[in-house]
From Swiss-Prot:
Protein name, as recorded: MEMO1 family protein Saci_0089
Family: Belongs to the MEMO1 family.
Domain of life where this protein originates: Archaea
Organism, scientific name: Sulfolobus acidocaldarius (strain ATCC 33909 / DSM 639 / JCM 8929 / NBRC 15157 / NCIMB 11770)
Leader sequence residues: none
Amino acid sequence: MIRIPAVAGSFYEADPVRLRKQIEWSFLHDLGPKSLPSVPQNKPPQRSNRFFVVPHAGYMYSGPVAAHAYYHLSLEGSPDTVIILGPNHTGLGSYVSIWHKGKWKTPLGEVSVDDEISLELVKLTEIIDIDERAHLYEHSIEVQIPFLQYLFGQNFKIVPIVIMMQTPDVAESLAEGIYKLVSSGKKDIVVLASSDLNHYEPHDKTIEKDNLAIDEIQKLDYKGLFRVVEEKDVTACGYGPIMTVLILAKKLGKKPYVLRHATSGDTSGDKSSVVGYLSVRFGD
């Protein structure tokens, strides 16, 4: 089965030439790394940065912030498999849904789903349903793929997982399953937590609320992040994916490094109602 892009032409350019230019614009932007990535031919023997938080809005808004995560990912070469955890914005499908086989198509080509890792995760966690419906119109995973294709071509596979039930218990179960796969060493696996931060408040208020969440991320405190989201009304859409990578980072002794925090107002100039964006790497 081939998953057809749902947001090409809206969240990012539908033309492949213009899309590559848009991705390069993201890397070179003042809010981005200000440099194009260069992927090494020979990977280091041990990957340091295995987990990332990356935003998922339209590239014209969040592309420069997202580019920071991808720049650091590029430094250690192409992984075998990228597990992409995203929130469910559509309400379709199961509580935790995986697209377990086939290919995902973007203007830059097709990328294969790692069916082996997908089925292993389903068995290990016992909370993931094989369910394509949740993915049909969901953008949180789709918008990550062109960045990955720009860096690595077709030399990687993906495991797309959409999370509707974003609770600490679900994050713990997902993290435990992913941890077993990563620590087995059978494949070089990277995990992306796709999330924006606070939504649709003035710039200063969004920065204030985002910082509450960022404080918990820097402490690797997934329950603290959940508490802040619930009690302080921080409207981060993908806190479930973030909680999962916080647990993984702690289990594998990785430290959080905030790469860039900004809002849509920083790129659009309109700071009256913005969305917060964050890139974080978890490494040695």
